[in-house]
Amino acid sequence: MSIFKQFGLVAIALLLGVAFSSCGENPFSGSSQSNGSLPSSNAEKPVTEINMAMIPWVSSEKQNEDIQQLEEYLTKTLSLPVKITLTKSYQASIDLLVEEKVEIAYLGPFSYIKAKERNPNLEPLVAHIEKSTARPWYSSVIIANTTAGINNLQDLKGKRFGFVSKSSTSGFLVASAQFKEMKIEPERDFAAVEYAGGHDKNLEALIAGTVDASAVNKITYLQFFDQGKLPEDQYKLIWESNPIPNSPIVISSQLPSQLKSKLQIAFINAPEGLVNVGGVRASGYTSVRDEDYDLIRKIQKNLEK
């Protein structure tokens, strides 16, 4: 049975609950070269500034414009200085939050699971609502260059493949689970495996001919498609996953409870134009809980077998 059929109903049940409640390193472990030591005390401390890390979903120029607007909104709403930093990698955002060098981070679902494994006191606060579906989920897709002779997943063997990051959910984890189900081992069966570092960069590598197929989130694919960058006579969507819980904004245990509540309300009440900071088509935020990401844990566990 396909892993996505196996967990599909679980995913939908979990996600409906969300919607209506408001390369030596092992890529599946939460370990890092950094020790990620936790603070010696979990006591609440006065907060005079909020620092937030954000994973690099799309080109930094566009994302930085959106970040500045969100910074200004949160600073005004919370009456506290808010500084948002776009990190150079997924792992950098994970490390900053785990080690509590920032109070908040915008992470992918798998990045959150990795961070939570290293710092159990972390918790998801909100996730964005997908504009096209009005639901807090999205999907992973694989886009192929048909001129390379690729029309389905089996055709990927012997071709060059692009992932986003080993900490990316839609750009690595979910696609890897599908490959495992099909007994495809990327490092063995593909001519080359590349990691672009961002979803837009992964599609740019496909267009440039650096890779023959790429795993990305469907949102970024649709943006490129709408812009005419992926003409149908050359590029084809050859696979799409079942729904994945959307990327959470995760908070540190050092934040006072009252501030956590204020942050959650601020995000949920944010104007629509301020919720697209991850390069996604979002219409708002909804509250989420740790158990909403159990599907990702199950996929991770299956891959570790």
Predicted feature residues:
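Bilobed "Venus flytrap"/periplasmic-binding protein-like clamshell domains
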Residues: V47, M52-T75, T87, F110, ...
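N-terminal hydrophobic or amphipathic helices and topogenic motifs
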Residues: S2-A92, V277-K305
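Short helices/loops that flank or line small-molecule/ion binding pockets
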Residues: Q91-Y106, R118-N119, Q154-K157, G198-I219
